[in-house]
């Protein structure tokens, strides 16, 4: 009787609360039949993005929800609660329902072990012929753990080399004032977490209590190959990330710049992700069109990569680095398309960069390889303070070993991309 009363109280509390924070576990793995596709959205939101996660979860409930052919599953870690595995579905009356399928013990979601556990539990409860994975949180591409925290950057105001965006140009006050004071005026609208006094903490993916998932750890956390992976996170659209993940997924959708904290328009994209076959190009177009139509926050970059073409990109790149590596130190780096703000000079356009050190014939061969790998790309004219030249936008970023950062160069040598192309010897 006591257990029945306890269960009743928990159920009542679950109904009252707006967030899906109930502790009830619904069903057992044996009750779930294998379907065509399962999509897991891994929302590591036990951080300053929690309200954005809440809004995105609500948006998912407004869009396409699969019936007999698929499962929409969300790993949801909101502050002050244990992570939950949620299934967005329809109940017996046809109304949208968010069922709590599994309640995880207290954990840090910005670890490889937590991600791997979430994927394995999802596969157990929601077996499918194919799986898609959306990684939602903070991110800073391929950089090693805590590199930002231990490597402060110069203020934008110290060199004045980067142009203002259209909003800043209309300001009657010093547009760099907040940078001079050590603050980023756009910190609240992008998926970037503030760190210590040195600047911003870095991570390949995820951020919680100072923990991050290194890109190499991320690969090891994926227990099987996904048909597609999407990063709703900053700066993941680089050749280093793509090449590291080439054996973990068939396709990637990500952004070479930062991403806005508002996230993807989930109510619009799910129909494309659950289509058969998955239409990542339509998904990317939906994302781009959504932000390109905005009046104030008209900022977005997006790329779709076919990972089976990346080996050829590396082969061609190696030929270029073998003959043009010595030219890197003398290139006009300010003339290369950048994808960073705040002088975080680790993300440049790969095609624009290669064109500076390759022969005309080599550059043409490389461009052909990139165009086969990047099957869709789009960018607004600006991403905040970064002008995006459509003729230079290849859809992929790269590191350029120009600033004599020995620690970063040593780490870069451990990445699969550098092992394949030999940019840094």
Question: Where are the regions a protein language model picked out?
Answer:
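Bacterial Sec-dependent N-terminal signal peptides
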Residues: 1-2, 16-39
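Bacterial N-terminal signal peptides that target proteins for export
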Residues: 1-9
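Loop/turn elements at helix/coil->beta-strand transitions in domains of secreted/extracellular proteins
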Residues: 36-38, 67-73, 126-132, 223-228, ...
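Solvent-exposed loop/turn segments at secondary-structure junctions
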Residues: 45-48, 78-82, 107, 137-143, ...
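N-terminal carbohydrate-binding/catalytic regions of secreted carbohydrate-active enzymes
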Residues: 49-84
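Short, solvent-exposed loop/turn and secondary-structure capping segments
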Residues: 52-53, 84-85, 143-148, 241-242, ...
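Surface-exposed loop and adjacent secondary-structure segments within mature catalytic domains
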Residues: 77-101, 130, 134-206
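Terminal, contiguous helix-loop blocks that mediate binding/assembly
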Residues: 164-425
């Amino acid at each position: 009787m006591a257990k029945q009363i306890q269960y009743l109280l928990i159920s009542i509390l679950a109904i009252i609360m707006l967030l899906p924070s109930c502790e009830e576990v619904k069903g057992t793995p044996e009750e779930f039949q294998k379907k065509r596709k399962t999509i897991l959205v891994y929302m590591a939101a036990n951080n300053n993005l929690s309200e954005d996660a809440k809004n995105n979860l609500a948006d998912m409930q407004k869009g396409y929800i699969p019936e007999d052919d698929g499962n929409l599953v969300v790993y949801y870690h909101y502050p002050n609660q244990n992570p939950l595995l949620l299934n967005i579905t329809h109940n017996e009356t046809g109304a949208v329902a968010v069922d709590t399928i599994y309640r995880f013990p207290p954990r840090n979601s910005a670890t490889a072990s937590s991600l791997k556990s979430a994927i394995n539990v999802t596969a157990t409860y929601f077996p499918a012929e194919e799986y898609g994975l959306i990684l939602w949180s903070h991110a800073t591409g391929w950089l090693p753990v805590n590199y930002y925290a231990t490597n402060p950057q110069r203020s934008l105001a110290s060199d004045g080399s980067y142009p203002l965006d259209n909003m800043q140009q209309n300001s009657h006050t010093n547009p760099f004032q907040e940078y001079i004071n050590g603050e980023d005026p756009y910190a609240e609208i992008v998926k970037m977490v503030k760190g210590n006094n040195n600047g911003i903490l870095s991570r390949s993916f995820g951020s919680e209590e100072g923990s991050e998932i290194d890109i190499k750890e991320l690969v090891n956390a994926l227990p099987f190959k996904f048909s597609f992976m999407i990063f709703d996170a900053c700066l993941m659209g680089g050749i280093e990330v793509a090449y590291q993940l080439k054996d973990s997924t068939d396709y990637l959708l990500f952004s070479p710049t930062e991403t806005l904290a508002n996230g993807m328009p989930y109510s619009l994209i799910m129909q494309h992700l659950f289509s058969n076959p998955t239409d990542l190009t339509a998904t990317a177009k939906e994302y781009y069109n959504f932000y390109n139509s905005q009046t104030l926050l008209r900022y977005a970059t997006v790329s779709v990569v076919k990972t089976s073409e990346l080996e050829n990109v590396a082969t061609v790149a190696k030929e270029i680095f073998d003959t043009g590596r010595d030219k890197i130190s003398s290139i006009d780096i300010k003339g290369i398309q950048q994808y960073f703000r705040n002088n975080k000079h680790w993300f440049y356009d790969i095609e624009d960069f290669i064109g500076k050190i390759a022969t005309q014939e080599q550059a043409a061969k490389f461009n052909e390889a990139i165009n086969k790998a990047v099957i869709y790309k789009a960018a607004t004219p600006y991403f905040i303070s970064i002008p995006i030249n459509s003729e230079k936008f290849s859809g992929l970023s790269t590191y350029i070993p120009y600033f004599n950062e020995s620690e970063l160069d040593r780490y870069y040598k451990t990445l699969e991309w550098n092992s394949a192309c030999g940019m840094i010897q």
